[in-house]
Design a protein with these regions (language model features):
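Short, hydrophobic beta-strand segments that form beta-sheet elements in well-ordered domains
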Residues: 3-5, 141-143, 161-171, 190-194, ...
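Short, acidic/turn-prone active-site loops that include or flank metal/cofactor-
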Residues: 84-85, 169-172, 217-221, 239-241
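Short beta->alpha connector loops
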Residues: 9-10, 84, 147-148, 195-198, ...
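Glycine-rich cofactor phosphate-binding loops and adjacent beta1-alpha1 units
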Residues: 173-235
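NAD(P)H dinucleotide-binding glycine-rich loop of Rossmann-like/cofactor-binding domains
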Residues: 80-139
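Mid-domain Rossmann-like dinucleotide-binding core that forms the NAD(H)/NADP(H) cofactor-binding site
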Residues: 118-185
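Glycine-rich beta-strand-centered segment in the early N-terminal region that forms part
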Residues: 18-33, 43-84
């Protein structure tokens, strides 16, 4: 079968179809969301094993379920979260969804309603932001990074955090109401590091106090390899939870969605991503 793999670069290759383990499902990808994870692999910042099938998150159709998985989900559309609590990072530590017939852990699936909107592809990042609300309520928070998890988390915290600061040293920027851009020091109680590339450097540059809360999105078990011991670290996983679909419907406008992501039919034009996210039409990629 055809798959997009890491092999001294990101390329399409013919690979052997993977077996369906007892708690896995076989899926066919419809739309794959390329993000900072794939950018980090492309630039060499994030190492993955050679021949690893990429694709951390997106919309898929469930084809077959393993023997320990409910058969009723077969034939349904689902979101694949970029992290499995049992097996680790999808498309990084285990094979991802950029294959004609991909296999992923069943605990990474969120079944979609029949009338789903393409904006639901942002589900993993919204789930992280909604969980962050419990940590930052009433506090000042600094968000580091210019990717989807940073911008969407900032958006979800408006009205919950006291003040929201965003440090983004990437070229592409999106303005959000209630979010202040910073380039130097400030007064915050909590740091959310949404950048895989430079968050430690920025923490040192902007300053952080012993005991400050450092919140990190959990996309891999093996990242980060270094954590400042003087900080109170909290990991936040993308999870299935109530309220995510409603939040996307009510708060993420078409205008904002189109500022954050762009659609593409070409792998070559999609990595590195020109916006925080690229929605790759996997059906067209594998048909060509």
């Amino acid at each position: 079968m055809k798959a997009i793999v890491f092999d001294l670069g990101i390329t399409m290759k013919d690979v052997v179809e993977r077996p369906i383990n007892k708690d896995y499902v076989m899926v066919s990808p419809s739309l794959v969301l390329l993000t900072g994870i794939e950018n980090a692999i492309y630039t060499g910042f994030l190492w993955v094993e050679p021949k690893r099938i990429l694709g951390s998150t997106g919309i898929v159709k469930v084809r077959n379920a393993g023997i320990e998985v409910d058969k009723n989900i077969e034939g349904k559309k689902a979101i694949v979260l970029p992290y499995s609590k049992k097996y680790g990072g999808i498309g990084t530590e285990i094979d991802g969804i950029l294959a004609e017939n991909a296999v992923v852990p069943s605990d990474s699936l969120v079944i979609l309603p029949n009338d789903y909107d393409v904006k639901y592809i942002l589900y993993p990042f919204v789930s992280i932001g909604l969980q962050l609300r419990k940590i930052v309520r009433g506090f000042n928070v600094l968000i580091i990074g210019g990717g989807l998890v940073s911008y969407i988390s900032a958006l979800t915290l408006v009205g919950y955090a006291n003040r929201i600061y965003l440090y983004n040293d990437d070229g592409y920027k999106v303005r959000l109401y209630g979010v202040e851009e910073v380039k130097d020091g400030g007064n915050w109680d909590i740091v959310f590091a949404g950048s895989m590339r430079s968050w430690i450097r920025i923490l040192l540059q902007l300053g952080s106090k012993e005991g400050d809360i450092l919140a990190l999105p959990r996309f891999l078990n093996s990242w980060p390899s270094i954590i400042p011991t003087r900080l109170n670290v909290k990991f936040i996983e993308p999870i299935k939870m109530d309220g995510v679909f409603d939040y996307i419907e009510d708060e993420i406008s078409d205008k904002l969605f189109n500022e954050l992501v762009v659609s593409s039919d070409s792998l070559e034009a999609s990595i590195p991503t020109p916006k925080p996210g690229v929605i790759l039409n996997a059906e067209k990629i594998f048909m060509s």
